[in-house]
Amino acid sequence: MAASAVCRAAGAGTRVLLRTRRSPALLRSSDLRGTATYAQALQSVPETQVSQLDNGLRVASEQSSQPTCTVGVWIDAGSRYESEKNNGAGYFVEHLAFKGTKNRPGNALEKEVESMGAHLNAYSTREHTAYYIKALSKDLPKAVELLADIVQNCSLEDSQIEKERDVILQELQENDTSMRDVVFNYLHATAFQGTPLAQSVEGPSENVRKLSRADLTEYLSRHYKAPRMVLAAAGGLEHRQLLDLAQKHFSGLSGTYDEDAVPTLSPCRFTGSQICHREDGLPLAHVAIAVEGPGWAHPDNVALQVANAIIGHYDCTYGGGAHLSSPLASIAATNKLCQSFQTFNICYADTGLLGAHFVCDHMSIDDMMFVLQGQWMRLCTSATESEVLRGKNLLRNALVSHLDGTTPVCEDIGRSLLTYGRRIPLAEWESRIAEVDARVVREVCSKYFYDQCPAVAGFGPIEQLPDYNRIRSGMFWLRF
């Protein structure tokens, strides 16, 4: 009885479906039409509003209907601006920012953030430092006040400095267990040897032990200036409100320098070279290979990002095998050449690192390197329209999905104003991506990959890592 009832229901449903398919009224119904197109969606993204205070501080925001907001300060300060003597000072200062200010000593700062139900975070890179708070939109005034206090009134008490010194030394030991972090520090050290970009963000342990209160004070007074900062916010807020709060809490921030004290970026030359740290007791080898890439604002970056999307990424835990769309991933999975690989395009103000990092068994290093370089050469000589279209769609997806939430949007605003001088709209990114075709990919890849000297870093059981001259010979093909 139940089965026959189901059959009758299914039959009735089919007749209704057939009738509705033939109904012109239903086809004309606005409720069933497609939603906004991709291009229309890009045009509807809220505008980023930018203002500037008299002292040079830039204030930027993107308003949305969300009940939360993220607000932060992005600063042109990082290990690239440090010398060998004070390398690690910026990272040290960032740590001290969480340990109280002159107005909120001890754990008073943490308690105030927690009482709001907010999250305070910070990070440092080779060129930038950021402090940001994610909170309810109604708590924006308090969040801006806290950020201003952190940036302008960092407590540099001797007792707190000594406590944090031990914490950072412990962190350095923990960082040495992250093979990926180690190999990328090695890659920077060999690629930019003898220049500030070779320095790690955390600095060497010798510097951590020696940095004094005077060193940290000098670093703050030199780099934490209004023209080097961006106050960025995203979420449920109004730009006028943010600008008024910035005027109230940041107008006293210094915006002038002595003539000889303006921080400048010295040129960082790229050196094709190799650094190897053999450790046979480790289970897997980590290898990174990169050529010199362009800086943030270079127009070639879009085509290179498409090329990286074509090469793709792979992790053996994801599955997929031979059916993966990336030729390199398919070969790696079918022949079990590696545990994982990923491409990267690390940009700095005037240079960058463009390459790939892979993790594999010690007996597969040679084969994985050979296949990877072969894919680069193939893009230089015979990239096809179909795979370029796939790479463009992957890049579009990554570009849009990355900006999901107030924190990623806020970070994008702050970083963009420091690197580009403006926030590039998604519609403009789309037009740049649309201009890329197979010819452009071949030309740009030939410019950066073909017959170029790479930098190579290896860590772990790397006995089978090819000699540098052999790796260099893999950067061109003797084919006609």
UniProtKB/Swiss-Prot annotation:
UniProt GO molecular function: metal ion binding
Keyword terms of this UniProt record: Acetylation, Electron transport, Membrane, Mitochondrion, Mitochondrion inner membrane, Phosphoprotein, Respiratory chain, Transit peptide, Transport
Targeting presequence: 1-34
N6-succinyllysine modifications at: K163
Keyword Cell membrane in annotation: no
Sequence positions bearing N6-acetyllysine: K111, K138, K163, K248
InterPro entries named among the record's database cross-references: Metalloenz_LuxS/M16, MPP/UQCRC_Complex, Pept_M16_N, Peptidase_M16_C
Subcellular location, record wording: Mitochondrion inner membrane
Location of Phosphoserine modifications: S212
Gene3D superfamilies associated with the record: Metalloenzyme, LuxS/M16 peptidase-like (3.30.830.10)
Recorded topology in the membrane: Peripheral membrane protein
GO cellular component terms attached to this protein's record: mitochondrial inner membrane; mitochondrion
Pfam families the UniProt entry points to: Peptidase_M16 (PF00675), Peptidase_M16_C (PF05193)
Subunit comment: Component of the ubiquinol-cytochrome c oxidoreductase (cytochrome b-c1 complex, complex III, CIII), a multisubunit enzyme composed of 11 subunits. The complex is composed of 3 respiratory subunits cytochrome b, cytochrome c1 and Rieske protein UQCRFS1, 2 core protein subunits UQCRC1/QCR1 and UQCRC2/QCR2, and 6 low-molecular weight protein subunits UQCRH/QCR6, UQCRB/QCR7, UQCRQ/QCR8, UQCR10/QCR9, UQCR11/QCR10 and subunit 9, the cleavage product of Rieske protein UQCRFS1.
Similarity comment text for this entry: Belongs to the peptidase M16 family. UQCRC1/QCR1 subfamily.
Stated role: Component of the ubiquinol-cytochrome c oxidoreductase, a multisubunit transmembrane complex that is part of the mitochondrial electron transport chain which drives oxidative phosphorylation.
Name used for this protein in its record: Cytochrome b-c1 complex subunit 1, mitochondrial
Phylogenetic lineage: Eukaryota, Metazoa, Chordata, Craniata, Vertebrata
Gene of this entry: UQCRC1
